[in-house]
UniProtKB/Swiss-Prot annotation:
PROSITE patterns found in the cross-reference section: LRR
Gene3D superfamilies, sorted: Ribonuclease Inhibitor
Protein known as: Dynein axonemal assembly factor 1 homolog
Organism: Drosophila pseudoobscura pseudoobscura (Fruit fly)
Short name of one Pfam family: LRR_4
UniProt function note: Cilium-specific protein required for cilia structures.
Gene name for this UniProt entry: dtr
Gene Ontology CC annotations of this record: axoneme
Length: 1582
């Protein structure tokens, strides 16, 4: 490994690089390789300046790795590259070959130009398939540095060039490389030092095909081998032979062509064939070759030509080269001469003097065998006989010419020699001729004789081989005969190194059928004599074979030195038939055999005596060995080495031979077999004292214990087996029973709970759509408590919910459980979250219906450029307005009482006066998102993309029907009250409060933007022109809600009493003391705002006292009630005092209340908040009777205030603007509820409107004890207060209606000057408690009725451009800006003004139609709907029924008043219509013709960039658009068409045109995507 310090120094000095994972991926990317390391099989890391190999473990599939031209000094970190085949490491700094053990598939290794001094670690055991090694330009010097190449058995390509090798011994290393084919040694000193460098290496490397820069051809190898055999002369001959062969090949090719031509020519015209150009040289070469052949044959005993002479075929010499007369004969003669030269050159010759014999012995013997085999094969072929005769003739003629004195000697017969026996010679010649001619019927051939002799030898002594042996045949074969085959061969070969049999074999194998010369015949005679002697010796040896065999059996172990010689014995014994045969032929051989037999006998006698001596010595050794064994036995207490057999446990000295054989090794066993048993063993070895040895006793004890333990173990195993079987049976039964029980119990419980939950939830969702509740507001029925039915045990059902919703109630509060179930049902939907498909469908249908118009042609006049310019202008104006609003809000941030700080990664509320920390209202999941949005919105540039982080919960517009201002509201109300009581102390606060309004918009609108925004709400607000000018009417409810939040903020968690500061307590006492004075003053004052503030203040004071008393009384009962709550089932409903904050549209209340009731509007805010304990029928009362149905938790005073508030809201919401600054100090009241503007139940899972797009009031943080007190104990008292409020409300209705007329006039004057874009549809949020069961009741009107009214009224007030702008925003999507919903209302051109003027003329007719709609609305809410209360409220059903009558009476009165005012045509008429209907409320003013609408629209467009919180007075004309939820698609369209038919037929005409809309859609990344949608819709125009 690279040392870090060394690597760091090197990097500092030379700037070397390291192999990093990122760098490797970059290189792969550059070379277009895979980014996944294991997918690459090649990697190029050359020329990178790397200093070590590292970080390659992930490249496990590499087959080729290039690391050349780096600075690598060590081969390392290649253990994971097990499939590497090629490794290139040239041009590096490597000094040692190592660490390649794991690369066993390496085939090519290049280490050239490194610093290696020794080849190592590349043997076949390490790199078994290494084929190529390039190690040029290193520091290799001698054979020691190359010694490891001997181990490379598979290396075939070796490049050692340009090293420093100078040792000629490397040739021996190359000889031991069997696969070496390519060798490069150039550039080394050894090339010049090695004599005959190229020939030597070619001879040393048998498989070499390429040396240095040239190939090794077969001719080169043949010349080198000739040079090795015969020196330079042999090499010259070999070269000539190759040249002749090449010339002959060419000549034969030409002659064959000539012959083909001569076939078609006449004899005189034939072309002569080509003759050999070197025939004379060939003749000389033939003569010299003959002489060399004679010398060689005479020296090595070859008698081929002698036999030819003896056969008398010398007359065949007539055929010679000179006798051929034609060119063809000459050519054939030349060819024969070539063949003769080739054969002569291949025959064995005597090595030349001066050459080392060691290098050539092996090659010469090999050549000899090859030549002999070739000659024998040729001689055995009868077809070659004439040619051989010609050759022999030539040889004999040359021989007789050169040596004439020897010729007569060949025919002389020596009387004392074998030559006198002419009959024998004739018989021999006849036999040889028959064999040569292929006659197999004659005498047997030498091979047949040989096989016959071998068979007879085995027959002669095989039967008597084991006669006298005392041992059994099996034992003898297994033990002694093993070595007998190798050792039992006795002969006297010591005297002669070459036996006669060997000579005879040579004679048989080398015999040829050529005529023999005299020298050959003489040599043959000598061989025959030797053969006779050998046969005689063999016969004599066979007679003593039995004795020799007996000696071998006795002394087998002593014959190891003679084993190899004895192996020749069977082949010698087969000479017996030959002996007899030879005796018949030659008397001389018989005499020689007799002499030889005598000598053999003498030798055998000597061997016997020697054997006896050896036997005697062996007996002495045996005795000493036995004595030593006894001593060892005594020393070891006679414990045997091994116990074996039955009854053989005796001391080792008493073991019998069989046991000894099994105990001893093979040699000792043979000694025991061959040894003579001593008769006095017992005398030599004294027996032990006792027969029972310690080993025997120990063995007996051990055997007994073993048997006993074996029995016990067997019994125990059986017992355990039985127990296991029984346990398995019991376990299987028990498992089945438990499994069945668990399945049944779990299924029964889980299925029951899930079925009930799902049924309730699904029924509520379906009922919600019918009753026009907001989408995503899922009221839940009664749900069993977590204690009774826990969700920890997973039901055996198919999982229908996401993993994070599988345990909805585990460790969660009631609110979190509700949130979880709501997410569950949202996830069950097939469409996007927070949206319902049927709502989309109905909106599209309604849009098509209401956009059917004849004036669509006007839209086609607009070009894309003009529309784009207009849109850009609107967007720029909106951005400027938003930036200004944000800047003002940020500038006033220091004037708040409370601030927000991040504490422990959470956003906390810091009280300015006390410094206490409060958590933001739950749920925590949404708070963090809200605060993050708040930080984003503080940046001016963030307004365009504010909706990007709100993909799950769409943002709602800033300009919304209601903007709660909790912090500023509390401050404002307190300051107003203190101003009236102590004017000199609080005179400067109203201005500040007004300046701070925008900041509070931003502060408290964020949470609402986290709610589940509804598509319809934004759509309605875009169409609601009434809300543009009447937004300030909601100020009364807003102010009261702020005070309510301020009051709740004072109640810290865990306290049962109000925690007020001293200043607040003093202020409260002053308010209480001056309560009656203020009330009288306000009664005398004609200003409705002052009177309303006073009433609200009185209600707040009264409510404060009631809360304090209730808290003290119920403090003792908190623990008991807590236990009851825990033991009872958890009700996921809103009935028992759960505080949900829902916004109600102020106009939805004013439609059915007399205008005089406004004075009680502010009081209704504080009173409505007390309805949290009950409220099951509050919404029903609101829809049917004009005021919320009283609940047991609401006092009568609150009810009266609520009614007055509704009546006041009916007469004009905008009149609240002028009175906001004079509101008295009103403290928050616990139990307030934020009311939805769509008359639907709020989303109880989030504490803010489920579908409205404005920020909700922050819910109070009240201690659980205080909540329990409100839940359980304020019910009866609240019921009494409800009845009192009802009475007071009736008395105050008349006065309020009278005051409303005056207020309308006042607001009318302020409207023109104060119209602002911020006065977009705003809704007064009257707090009222709504239970869960209440949310499921029918609301004011179904969705189909709303859509019908929309279709019939919308086109009367909007010109086509305004309608297009209206549709340019996607439903329910908002970018979170103040005036985003007014983009369609801010830019009116002349056409829009004309349309509005024409629309104003239809006021009277519309008023009549609205009267009819009011009647229809009242009919839609039948008293029967009140029966839809869930079982949760059954205990209070009676009290509710009692209150219902009173409310219905009041509702009837209010309805009568409304109808009267509508008939008269007063300006208040238009504000009495239900907000759920699409209405046009236009007072019958004489100034309409003068263009008040144009002024109003111009003023609104100018104020678009100003503060959105400037509230204009009551407008003269406005269109009210309220939120609704459509019903099922099957109902909606039909009802819509049915509803709009009568109105359209009397007032409008329909025209179908095509309109394009730009919809702002949030994609998955949170970015705003503008989609252009074309819709064909039916728009109604005047």
């Amino acid at each position: 490994m690279c040392e870090r310090g060394f690597a760091r120094r090197r990097e500092e000095v030379t700037g070397l690089n390291r192999i990093t994972e990122k760098g490797l991926k970059d290189i792969c990317k550059r070379d277009k390789l895979y980014q996944t390391p294991r997918l690459n099989d090649v990697l190029y890391l050359h020329f990178q300046g790397y200093q070590c190999i590292e970080n390659l473990d992930e490249y496990t599939e590499l087959k080729s790795l290039w690391l050349e031209s780096n600075a690598i000094s060590e081969i390392q970190n290649l253990t994971k590259l097990t499939k590497l085949k090629c490794l290139y490491l040239q041009n590096n700094l490597i000094t040692k070959m190592e660490n390649l053990e794991f690369n066993r598939e390496l085939d090519t290794l290049n280490l050239s130009q490194n610093h290696i001094r020794k080849i190592e670690n590349i043997g076949t055991d390490i790199l078994p398939v290494l084929n190529t090694l390039n190690i040029t330009s290193n520091y290799l010097t001698d054979s020691a540095s190359l010694a490891a190449l001997v181990e490379c058995k598979t290396l075939s390509v070796l490049d050692l060039s340009n090293n420093r090798i100078d040792d000629i011994l490397i040739v021996k290393i190359f000889e031991q490389m069997p696969s070496l084919k390519v060798l490069v040694l150039q550039g080394n000193p050894v090339v010049s030092r090695l004599p005959q460098y190229r020939k030597t290496l070619i001879l040393a490397c048998k498989e070499l095909t390429y040396l240095d820069s040239r190939p090794v051809f077969p001719r080169d190898r043949a010349c080198a081998e000739a040079w090795k055999r015969e020196g330079y002369e042999g090499e010259r001959k070999e070269v000539q032979r190759w040249n002749r062969a090449e010339r002959r090949k060419t000549r034969e090719s030409v002659n064959s062509t000539i012959r083909m031509r001569n076939r078609h020519l006449k004899p005189e015209d034939q072309v002569p064939l080509l003759t050999s150009s070197d025939s004379e040289e060939e003749q000389k070469g033939i003569s010299s070759a003959e002489k060399a052949q004679k010398r060689a044959e005479m020296e090595y005993g070859s008698v081929d030509t002698m036999w030819d002479e003896v056969s008398g075929e010398s007359q065949a010499s007539e055929h010679s080269t000179t006798s051929s007369t034609s060119a063809e004969d000459n050519e054939s003669a030349g060819s024969q001469a070539d063949h003769i030269a080739e054969r002569i050159s291949n025959r064995r010759v005597k090595p030349l003097e001066g050459r080392p014999k060691v290098l050539y012995d092996e090659a010469a013997s090999g050549d000899e065998k090859a030549v002999t085999t070739t000659d024998s094969k040729k001689d055995s072929n009868a077809e070659d006989l004439p040619e051989l005769k010609d050759i022999t003739e030539a040889l004999l003629q040359s021989d007789t010419a050169s040596k004439p004195p020897l010729q007569p000697t060949l025919l002389q017969s020596d009387s004392g020699s074998e030559m006198d026996n002419t009959a024998d010679l004739e018989q021999t010649c006849q036999t040889l001729l028959q064999v040569a001619q292929g006659n197999d019927d004659g005498d047997p051939t030498p091979k047949q004789i040989k096989s016959q002799m071998i068979d007879e030898m085995y027959e002669s002594f095989g039967s008597d081989l084991f006669e006298e042996h005392p041992l059994p045949i099996d034992q003898l074969l297994n033990e002694s005969t093993k070595k007998y085959q190798l050792e039992a061969k006795v002969c006297c070969e010591e005297e002669t190194t070459k036996t006669p049999r060997d000579l005879y074999k040579e004679f048989i194998e080398e015999v040829t059928w050529r005529p023999k010369s005299k020298e050959q015949l003489e040599r043959e005679q000598e061989c025959v004599d030797a053969s006779e002697k050998c046969a005689h010796d063999l016969a004599e040896m066979g007679s003593h074979l039995e004795e020799d065999l007996q000696e071998l059996r006795d002394f087998t172990e002593n014959l190891s030195s003679d084993v190899q010689e004895q192996a020749k014995d069977p082949s010698e014994s087969d000479e017996e038939p030959t002996e007899e045969e030879m005796e018949v032929k030659s008397q001389l051989l018989k005499e020689q055999f007799q002499d030889r037999k005598k000598r053999l006998k003498e030798a055998i006698e000597e061997r016997k005596t020697m054997q006896k001596n050896l036997e005697a010595r062996k007996e002495d050794l045996n005795k000493s060995y036995n004595l030593f064994a006894k001593i060892m036995d005594d020393a070891t207490d006679n414990v045997p080495k091994r116990v074996f057999g039955a009854g053989c446990d005796v001391p080792s000295k008493d073991w019998d031979k069989e046991e000894c054989m099994q105990q001893l090794p093979l040699t000792s066993m043979e000694d025991s077999i061959n040894g003579r048993p001593s008769s006095n063993d017992e005398d030599i070895l004294t027996r032990p004292l006792t027969e029972l040895t310690s080993a025997e006793a120990a063995e007996e004890i051990c055997s007994q214990l073993d048997r006993k333990l074996a029995g016990e173990e067997e019994a125990l195993r059986q017992l355990l087996c039985d127990l296991e079987n029984e346990n398995e049976i019991l376990y299987s039964i028990e498992t089945q029973i438990k499994y069945a029980e668990s399945i049944s119990v779990e299924d029964s419980q889980s299925q029951m709970v899930c079925a009930s939950l799902l049924n309730d939830l699904i029924s509520d969702v379906i009922y919600k759509d019918i009753t026009e509740m907001g989408p995503n507001s899922y009221p839940l029925g009664p749900i069993e408590s977590d204690e009774e039915y826990t969700y920890s045990e997973e039901p055996k059902l198919e999982k229908m919910v996401p993993p994070h919703l599988e345990n909805p109630a585990g460790g969660k509060s009631l609110r979190e459980c509700v949130d979880t179930f709501k997410e569950f049902f949202a996830s069950k939907g097939n469409d996007k979250p927070r949206q319902e498909s049927h709502t989309h469908l109905e909106k599209i249908r309604a849009a098509k219906a209401l956009l059917k118009s004849k004036s669509l042609a006007e839209f086609s006049k607009d070009t894309p450029e003009s529309l784009d310019a207009q849109l850009a202008k609107d967007e720029d104006r909106r951005k400027r307005h938003v930036a200004a609003s944000a800047g003002r809000c940020f500038a006033k941030r220091e004037k708040y009482d409370d601030t927000l700080e991040v504490v422990d990664n959470r956003l906390m509320v810091v009280k300015k006066d006390t410094g206490e920390l409060e958590e933001l209202p739950p749920p925590p999941e949404l708070i963090s998102d809200s605060e993050s949005e708040k930080e984003v919105e503080e940046d001016d540039d963030a307004y365009d993309t504010a909706e990007e982080t709100l993909q799950e919960y769409p943002r709602v517009p800033w300009t919304t029907p209601y903007k709660p201002k909790p912090r500023k509201a509390a401050e404002h109300l307190v300051n107003e009250a203190m101003q009236r009581v102590l004017a000199e102390q609080f005179s400067e606060l109203p201005d500040d409060t007004k300046e701070n309004e925008p900041q509070e918009d931003e502060f408290f609108s964020l949470e609402a933007k986290e709610t589940f925004g509804n598509l319809d709400s934004e759509f309605f607000q875009k169409l609601d022109l009434d809300k543009v000018t009447t937004a300030n009417n909601a100020e009364a409810a807003t102010e009261c809600m702020r005070s309510y939040n301020e009051l709740k903020a004072c109640m810290k968690s865990g306290s049962t009493e109000l925690q007020l500061t001293s200043e607040e307590n003093e202020m409260l006492q002053e308010m209480l003391s001056s309560n009656e004075d203020l009330e009288a003053k306000h009664k005398s004052n004609d200003d409705p705002l002052v009177e309303r503030d006073n009433e609200l203040l009185n209600k707040m004071m009264q409510r404060m006292k009631e809360h304090e008393e209730r808290a003290r009384e119920l403090q003792e009962q908190l623990e008991k009630e807590k236990e009851e709550e825990n033991s009872g089932p958890i009700k996921l409903s809103m009935g028992e005092g759960s505080m949900l904050y829902q916004r109600w549209s102020p106009l939805s209340l004013t439609e059915i209340i007399d205008p005089q009731a406004e004075e009680g509007g502010r009081q209704a805010e504080e009173g409505g908040a007390q309805q949290e304990e009950g409220g099951a029928q509050s919404e029903e009362g609101d829809d049917q009777a004009g005021v919320p149905q009283a609940e047991e938790g609401v006092t009568q005073g609150e009810e009266s205030v609520l009614q007055e508030e509704e009546t006041h809201a009916e007469n004009g919401v905008a009149q609240a603007e002028g009175r906001v600054l004079q509101s008295p100090v009103i403290y928050p009241i616990i139990g307030y509820e934020d009311i939805d503007d769509d008359d639907a139940a709020s989303d109880f899972t989030t504490d803010y409107s489920s579908d409205d797009e404005v920020a909700v009031v922050v819910p109070p943080k009240i201690s659980p004890a205080m909540l329990k007190a409100y839940y359980y104990d304020g019910f009866e008292e609240d019921m009494r207060m409800v009845r009192e409020n009802e009475a007071r409300t009736r008395r105050g209705l008349r006065a309020i209606m009278q005051k409303e007329k005056q207020m309308w006039k006042d607001n009318e004057e302020e409207m023109a000057a104060d119209m602002a874009p911020s006065a977009s549809p705003k809704e007064e949020h009257i707090p009222e408690v709504k239970s869960e069961t209440e949310t499921a009741k029918p609301t004011v009107e179904t969705a189909k009725d709303k859509w019908a009214k929309i279709a019939s009224r919308l086109n009367e007030f909007l010109d086509p451009e305004a309608m297009e702008q209206l549709e340019s925003h996607e439903f329910g999507e908002s970018d979170g800006e103040d005036d985003v919903d007014l983009t369609g209302l801010q830019n009116y051109d002349e056409e829009s003004e004309t349309e509005c003027e024409s629309a104003l003329k239809e006021t009277t007719e519309i008023g009549d139609s609205e009267k009819q709609e009011n009647k229809t609305q009242d009919e839609t809410l039948d008293p029967k709907d009140t029966e839809a209360i869930t079982d949760e409220w059954s205990p209070y059903q009676t009290s509710f029924e009692e209150n219902r009558t009173a409310f219905c009476d009041r509702h009837n009165k209010l309805t009568m008043i409304t109808e009267q005012t509508s008939d008269v045509g007063d300006p208040e008429t238009e504000t009495t219509k239900l907000i759920c209907q699409w209405e046009k409320i236009i007072p019958e003013d004489s100034k309409i013709g003068d263009g008040p609408t144009e002024k109003f629209l111009d003023q609104k467009a100018q104020d678009n960039t100003e503060n959105t919180d400037e509230r204009p007075e009551n407008p003269k004309n406005f269109i009210t658009l309220d939120y609704f939820v459509d019903t099922e698609p099957s109902e909606s369209l039909e009802d819509t068409e049915a509803t709009e038919t009568p109105e359209v037929s009397t007032e409008q005409t329909l025209k179908t045109e095509q309109m394009e809309f730009n919809l702002d859609v949030l994609n998955d990344d949170g970015d705003v995507v503008i989609k252009e949608v074309t819709v064909e819709a039916q728009v109604t125009y005047q």
